[in-house]
């Protein structure tokens, strides 16, 4: 029962499998058959049985079908056999037709192949044309690039390269020639860089050579503009009725207008002739090189190279020649090169972007300015010619004004000019020292004579002299001063003008200029003129008459100082009442010179007295005096009288001092003559003769050779001699010794040492002519008295030395 139930269950399954096999593609039968074996054991046998049964069913169906269609098949075969004969005939016909068709189509095939070949060629040509149309623009651009390179149009060439790389090469990048072009472009760029850099180097060398011409042109232009402005200012001043002074002479207004008109016309002509920096230098290499490096993306390299090279050139330009200080052309060449350098840099700054910056030019200018100041300070110190220093100042002002017009700060240059101004004044002082020396050498040191009104006015026009008494005198007459006074006055004014020349164009106020003029004039008076006067006074050949005239001259020069102050005031238009106005020190200068001259008068006078005294020829052993004064002394007194008459033109105090000094010196000289250590013995006759000479000196003193002495003041110069001689002449030793040291002593001025020295010279020791020889014969008691006096005098001398 169980087996039957299992068999019943497998039958539907086997039918399903068979249906699946019949309806499924043979490729998928494998899994279906595998399921037969995966089922129950012996299931495949049952399946085989079922399969055999199914096959038998199908065979039966086929057999039924064949039996049904068999007659039709037989009929079809019969029909087919009948058609077979016709088919063979048709085959023969078709074969013949085919042969004939093949024979006929051989030419067509040949022509067709030709057509195909032509079509292929046509297609290839079309393709080539299309490719060539792509390549031709590239080749044309590359050819254009070559032409631009040949024509040195490098910036355009670089632009063409950019177009080739960005537009044209992508179209034909697959072709070999394009790769060659692409590989060649970097080399062309490097060539362009090298060529443009070479052009830049040539440009830098060119502007280095032309810097002086560029600077000269720029400085001329600045000078013309300044002159034009000054001319306009003068013209405007004339319109307002202001008086114009050119140099020292006042020029009428009509002449001024003519001069200014001519000046303006000349300025217009000069401006037309002036070239600009663009006219002198071709800047295209710089622009071209800058654009090229900008296109190449290497602008920073170009800027660094340009700035580095220009700094090197700046150092070369700023290096002066060793002999630059010898001529103004050396300074001019130095300035023009520097101006040319910075004019080029300023032009580059304004026409390019980034190549030169304001910070860079300022740094370069500050470096250059420090070097320029150091160079000018060093080289100007070698200048000894004031004209050269003045030309250097004018050049420096034009140099500063030129660069200031281009925006460079130049205040330090004007500060330097103030330093150079001190040096300029020093050179002026040295020059005027020579001028003053020449004036003093040429002066005859005698009053200026004038014989008519014309000569009188000429002197008055040169020197501000006012004397109503002299004006009233009839011709011929004489000015009290000598010829050097108006010459000195004129030269002082010339010095002021020369000093003013340097102060012009320094952008300083009138007050500062006035102060500078007064200070420089003070230096001229207190140092140069004073030194020249002192040297003149001390010269050996200057005599007493000349010294007297020098004192008179200094008096008039001192009085003229106020006119010099007015002269400076008229130039600067600064009132003397201004608080900070410097006063001229001429008063003290001429006072010092006058005092020196007075002292030299005293010295010269004493020297002259010494010369007369040296002529003294006393016979110190004479027994009796000659009865008259010595000849040398009378000559001396006559000389002193004539000299003191000349002193009447001097101030009274000077003449009195000179007279007193002369008498004191004469008294001292006579005293020294008596006490001379080489004089061993003196006779009483010699003393009496000497007394006669002293009496003449006292008579001269009492005759009042110079007015103004009170009483016997001048005679007191000989009081020492008088008391000494009276003591020996009267032989009043008892009174001298008794009253010694008393204020009311008759011989108060006689020094014991002096008396002892003279007494010993008169004492007879061993010589037969001794004055005391007769005493030993006639009166030995008196001899003892003398010995006693000598001992007492020595005692007084020793007492004095102990107190000292």
Swiss-Prot record:
Compartments (UniProt record): Cytoplasm; Cytoplasm, Perinuclear region; Cell projection, Growth cone; Midbody, Midbody ring
Q: What GO biological process terms does the UniProt entry carry, in alphabetical order?
A: exocytosis; Golgi to plasma membrane transport; intracellular protein transport; membrane fission; mitotic cytokinesis; vesicle docking involved in exocytosis; vesicle tethering involved in exocytosis
- The record's principal subcellular location, in a coarse class, is cytoplasm
The record's listing under InterPro entries reads: EXOC6/Sec15, EXOC6/Sec15_C, EXOC6/Sec15_C_dom1, EXOC6_Sec15_N, EXOC6PINT-1/Sec15/Tip20_C_dom2
Query: Gene Ontology terms, cellular component aspect?
Result: cytosol; exocyst; Flemming body; growth cone; perinuclear region of cytoplasm; plasma membrane
- Domain of life, per UniProt, equals Eukaryota
Question: Keywords assigned by UniProt?
Answer: Cell projection, Cytoplasm, Exocytosis, Protein transport, Transport
What does this chain do?
Component of the exocyst complex involved in the docking of exocytic vesicles with fusion sites on the plasma membrane. Together with RAB11A, RAB3IP, RAB8A, PARD3, PRKCI, ANXA2, CDC42 and DNMBP promotes transcytosis of PODXL to the apical membrane initiation sites (AMIS), apical surface formation and lumenogenesis.
**Subunit description:** The exocyst complex is composed of EXOC1, EXOC2, EXOC3, EXOC4, EXOC5, EXOC6, EXOC7 and EXOC8. Interacts with CNTRL. Interacts with RAB11A in a GTP-dependent manner.
The family annotation for this protein states: Belongs to the SEC15 family.
Report the protein name in the record: Exocyst complex component 6
**Which organism does this sequence originate in?**
Homo sapiens
> The organism's lineage?
Eukaryota, Metazoa, Chordata, Craniata, Vertebrata
Q: Which gene encodes it?
A: EXOC6
